[in-house]
């Protein structure tokens, strides 16, 4: 009898957001905006959340659109890492 292993690839969460601060060394603050449908009023409610992400080469600047991915905790507040800069600020 053969045993088949059911292996699942656990995907890491990833977000696209706008850099709001790059003042810290190797750290950026990314604001991620989401829209959700309100159950009772059937209107879209927008909300935003800020994440601190690790930027190894200090490549991102304020206003850039970036993609961040979940990572093991790097410090008390940082558990996200910059993967790519999608669009530079004008």
Swiss-Prot record:
GO biological-process terms attached to the record: translation
Pfam families per UniProt: Ribosomal_S17
Keyword Cytoplasm part of the UniProt annotation: no
Keywords annotated in UniProt: Ribonucleoprotein, Ribosomal protein, RNA-binding, rRNA-binding
Stored InterPro entries: NA-bd_OB-fold (IPR012340), Ribosomal_uS17 (IPR000266), Ribosomal_uS17_bact/chlr (IPR019984), Ribosomal_uS17_CS (IPR019979)
GO MF term list: rRNA binding; structural constituent of ribosome
Tree of life domain: Bacteria
Matching SUPFAM superfamilies: Nucleic acid-binding proteins
GO cellular component: cytosolic small ribosomal subunit
Family named by the database record: Belongs to the universal ribosomal protein uS17 family.
Description of how the protein assembles with itself and partners: Part of the 30S ribosomal subunit.
Function according to Swiss-Prot or TrEMBL: One of the primary rRNA binding proteins, it binds specifically to the 5'-end of 16S ribosomal RNA.
Protein name as it appears in the record: Small ribosomal subunit protein uS17
Organism: Treponema denticola (strain ATCC 35405 / DSM 14222 / CIP 103919 / JCM 8153 / KCTC 15104)
């Amino acid at each position: 009898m053969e045993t088949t292993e059911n292996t699942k690839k656990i995907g890491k969460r990833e977000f696209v957001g706008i850099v709001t601060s790059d003042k810290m060394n190797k750290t950026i603050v990314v604001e991620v905006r989401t829209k959700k449908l309100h159950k009772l009023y059937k209107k879209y409610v927008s909300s935003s959340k800020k994440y601190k992400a690790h930027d190894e080469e200090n490549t991102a600047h304020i206003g850039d659109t970036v993609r961040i991915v979940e990572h093991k905790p790097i410090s008390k507040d940082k558990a996200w890492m910059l993967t790519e800069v999608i669009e530079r600020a004008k």
